[in-house]
Amino acid sequence: MQSYSRLMQFKVKDLMIDKRRLVEVPDNATLGDALNTMVANRVRAVPVAAKPGQWLGAGGSMIVELDKQSGSARKQYIGMVTMLDVVAHIAGDDGESGLDKKMAAPVSSIIGHCPEGLSLWSLNPNTSIMDCMEMLSKGIHRVLVPLDSNTENITGPELVESASAYAMLSQMDLISFFFDQSSQLHGILSHTVTDLSAIHNTVLALTSQARVKDAIQCMSIAMLNAVPIVEASGEGEDHKQLVDGKNRRVVGTFSASDLKGCHLATLRSWLPLNALEFVEKIPRTLLFTAATSTPGRELVTCHVTSTLAQVIHMVTTKRVHRVWVVDQNGGLQGLVSLTDIIAVVRSALLSGAPDLF
């Protein structure tokens, strides 16, 4: 319990040290512009900034950036655009000209296409790590943190905020914090993902015969950021649909973030490709090499006997947002996501069970 008490002393501002300047796009930027910005800055999402007072922010939010000298409102963040928004927007059978038209759409028109974009949250820098964990364990992947909040006495999530500067806090930042504090969390992290109930046992998958355009369509409908690719059964299954991946051998991962490796012209020519071919080609493009620190397309997997410490090491070093759980033959058993990791660590800390400290 002593290590738990030390952990409780950390606040969100302790996670914001050395965070870089916020990467954003204006509301009149095209979807193509937003994609280029995400590629150039190696991020999976960008907030959308507009002139203050002209938009209702996502989820009724009012998150405003102030001029540091005058205190007047300079811009309002009206929502967030993610790689999954890109996938959802370009999904469909509209042909090449349709793709061009879709990528020319203003980003303001696609905010809220995916559940994450339905709200925009800020988190006060004085918020405790435990409260931060609660928020990020409920499907919220990232929040804005004011660097000089005008609401110093308020902690927790807010839909209304004003500050002269913001930074982004993501689930990965919190997982990296767990990694850095592994000595304090040893009692929890040394348990297996099975013991901690961190595994999602049902996983939808693409078959190895699915095409890129079908993969995009499936992910858009299911609102999934990534899906495993499993060996096709050869039994006449529909490769245009997601299948139950249980016990099938995993051969790859198709992720919305893979699109960061594509120029528009490249994406256009690759849409008819087999999805597995696509994920194998992506690492060899110069654009993808520049946009990721992960060499090649290594399949990141764990076992039911893997410890949470091992899984956290995988996600932080490989920079992946989920780990497929497989058996000794590579058969898919489930997955562990960043949301799952945060939820089980928080639950274990709150339980105060003696064997977890």
Curated annotation (Swiss-Prot):
Disruption phenotype: No visible phenotype; probably due to a complementation by PV42b. Shorter siliques and reduced seed sets in pv42a and pv42b RNAi double mutant.
InterPro entries for the chain: AMPK_gamma/SDS23_families, CBS_dom, CBS_dom_sf
Alphabetical GO biological process terms: embryo sac development; stamen development
CBS domain: residues covered: 16-97, 113-185, 198-273, 293-351
Keywords: CBS domain, Repeat
Tissue: Expressed highly in rosette leaves, cauline leaves, open flowers, developing siliques and dry seeds, but at a low level in stems and floral buds.
Domain of life: Eukaryota
SMART domains named among the record's database cross-references: CBS (SM00116)
Family: Belongs to the 5'-AMP-activated protein kinase gamma subunit family.
Functional summary from the UniProt entry: Plays redundant role with PV42a in regulating male gametogenesis and pollen tube guidance.
Listed name of the protein: SNF1-related protein kinase regulatory subunit gamma-like PV42b
Biological source species: Arabidopsis thaliana (Mouse-ear cress)
